[in-house]
């Protein structure tokens, strides 16, 4: 049987072609191994149709590195600085005609499968599809940390929650608030009110969470003499006669601490290492085939000065697609949403827009005196999803990742 001149991203299942196509698919890619990263480009045309889900398969990382590092073996992650893990990150160049879903490689002996996030009918010319693989240090989220925000309004506490504490002499005292929620016309959410005790002098708090249960704490405010814990519920959905218990571990340090709870009615999962980007605000209507900027109003801080977050597309909705973007510490994010359907879509509170991962992004010392455009032209500059430019010379060497030297 004659081998087809071109192959689509959807695999043929015919057993007669299986072996031949596997060998043929590998010939679609040229792999260049550098000291700190791998670059992959297509050496043949690739025809994409709107229903395609995958690009042609690529050899495993171990096969790609076999000539340079014959004994290369990597378990998928390696401990980095405190609270971090280094993994091999796969993503496509921002100028690629077809976007692929970024992924972390967990098994270096498996073929690489590139998932298309938004397919359209097109032909990718040889050499125009570029994919990178490099070690990236991710922050391992170890709990839900919220910043203690300043409440400058004067509060007269007609009622106060019961407050209990443990480990009060330690660096991380624990406080438990118990009482009925309060609501007034000036507040968008019900809240618990308590006296400000010494543990609340800390900058942030780890909210006690339960696996597979929704954490109802939205944010924490403190005034001169009071503390207010906002509850993430609509007033019509809450029973003001019920008792609410909130556990907080106060601290001055956290890998990532948010201004508001980003999980927004999502059950807590200790294994999850990305956070959902869920819109909260007025409805935004996007006509068919058009795009619109959507503001994500949450902010965060980190103990690492070179930490940043990358927001990428999620699989939660087939009607729209978001462009990758960077979410910097202390800043809100502007997410460009494209309506990929044939009818108008509405972005409303609770809409899951994407996912964010937190990384350490090695910077260039010259960044303060050079424009970003000039920095990106440096030989060691690599651009991650969201236009995050890092210094590839500061990421681990591929040879140093191998468990076999």
Swiss-Prot record:
It comes from Saimiriine herpesvirus 2 (strain 11) (SaHV-2). This is Uncharacterized gene 11 protein. The gene is 11. It comes from the Viruses. InterPro entries: Herpes_Orf11.
């Amino acid at each position: 049987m004659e081998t087809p001149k071109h192959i689509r991203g959807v695999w043929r299942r015919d057993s007669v072609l299986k072996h031949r196509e596997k060998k043929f698919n590998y010939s679609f890619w040229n792999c260049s191994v550098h000291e700190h990263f791998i670059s992959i480009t297509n050496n043949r045309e690739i025809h994409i149709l709107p229903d395609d889900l995958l690009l042609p398969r690529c050899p495993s990382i171990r096969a790609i590195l076999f000539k340079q590092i014959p004994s290369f073996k990597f378990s998928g992650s390696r401990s980095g600085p405190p609270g971090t893990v280094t993994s091999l990150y796969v993503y496509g160049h921002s100028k690629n005609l077809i976007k692929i879903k970024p992924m972390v490689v967990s098994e270096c002996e498996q073929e690489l499968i590139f998932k298309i996030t938004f397919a359209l009918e097109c032909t990718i010319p040889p050499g125009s599809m570029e994919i990178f693989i490099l070690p990236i240090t991710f922050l391992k989220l170890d709990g839900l940390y919220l910043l203690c925000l300043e409440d400058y309004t004067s509060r007269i506490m007609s009622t106060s929650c019961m407050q209990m504490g443990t480990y009060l002499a330690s660096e991380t005292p624990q406080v438990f608030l118990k009482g009925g929620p309060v609501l007034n016309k000036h507040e968008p959410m019900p809240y618990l009110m308590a006296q400000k005790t010494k543990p609340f002098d800390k900058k942030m708090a780890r909210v006690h969470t339960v696996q597979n249960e929704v954490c109802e704490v939205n944010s924490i405010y403190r005034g001169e003499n009071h503390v207010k814990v906002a509850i993430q519920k609509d007033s019509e959905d809450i029973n003001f006669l019920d008792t609410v218990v909130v556990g907080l571990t106060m601290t001055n340090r956290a890998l990532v601490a948010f201004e508001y709870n980003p999980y927004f009615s999502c059950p807590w999962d200790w294994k999850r290492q990305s956070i959902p980007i869920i819109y909260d605000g007025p409805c935004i209507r996007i006509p068919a085939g058009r795009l619109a900027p959507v503001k994500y109003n949450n902010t965060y801080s980190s103990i690492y000065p070179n930490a940043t977050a990358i927001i990428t597309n999620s699989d939660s909705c087939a009607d729209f697609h978001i462009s990758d973007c960077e979410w910097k510490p202390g800043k809100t994010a502007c997410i460009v949403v494209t309506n990929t359907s044939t009818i108008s879509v509405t972005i409303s509170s609770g809409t899951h827009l994407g996912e964010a991962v937190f990384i350490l992004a090695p910077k260039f010392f010259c960044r303060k005196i050079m424009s970003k455009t000039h920095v990106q032209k440096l030989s060691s500059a690599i651009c991650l999803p969201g236009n995050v430019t890092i210094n590839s010379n500061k990421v681990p060497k591929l040879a140093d990742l191998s468990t076999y030297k």
